[in-house]
A protein has these predicted regions:
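Contiguous, well-ordered alpha-helical segments that form the cores/surfaces of helical PPI scaffolds
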Residues: 90-103, 121
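Conserved catalytic cores of very large enzyme subunits
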Residues: 1-86, 107-181
Length: 181
């Protein structure tokens, strides 16, 4: 019998990793303490989203939920859709991994990606742990977020100003990409 997992993303919330490192430094806190705060915040948002969506009736999207557009999507219009949600993901988005590494030690992830890799392993271990605890399919998502990447620069600059190779362009890099120049 085929197994279908991660065939539908219920939502992604993207971490602004350079902002988290800058905040930790400004507040003289451990980076992972601040990162945990945001990981838990996103976890709680995802759990609320899952519960909210699970209470929706199949009639909100009859092609997907009543006419078989999604695996198991043969519910009656008044049925709640919670039974269809288990194979769907709740994602932690990653942007600006290269800028995180640059802020950490001035090097790109091509020159020295150790800290960036350490952070990704940490987030992966965290999501694996909470998958078991919450029985939800959490995922890590390399955010392809062109408009978000521009917004994140504005947010960073507003608080921390222009930092060379971190916030001196009009956008941060998508997910784990490097700037080309």
């Amino acid at each position: 019998k085929p197994v279908f997992e991660g065939r539908f993303n219920l939502g992604v919330v993207s971490l602004h990793l350079p902002m988290i490192l800058a905040k930790a430094r400004r507040e003289s806190k451990d980076f992972y303490e601040v990162l945990n705060y945001y990981l838990e915040m996103i976890r709680n948002l995802h759990k609320r989203t899952y519960e909210y969506i699970g209470e929706l009736r199949a009639s909100v999207n009859p092609i997907a939920f009543c006419e078989g557009g999604l695996l198991g999507g043969h519910l009656k219009p008044d049925d709640k859709i919670k039974s269809l949600l288990p194979p769907m993901t709740l994602s932690y988005g990653i942007t600006a991994l290269n800028e995180l590494q640059r802020l950490y030690n001035g090097k790109s992830i091509r020159e020295d990606g150790e800290f960036a890799l350490e952070v990704m392993k940490y987030i992966n271990n965290y999501t694996n742990k909470i998958k078991e605890e919450d029985h939800l399919l959490y995922a890590i998502y390399g955010t392809p977020a062109e408009s978000l990447c521009g917004l994140q620069i504005k947010q960073f600059r507003k608080i921390y100003g222009i930092v060379e190779n971190v916030s001196d362009r009009e956008y941060v890099s998508n997910s784990f990409h490097c700037q080309v120049s």
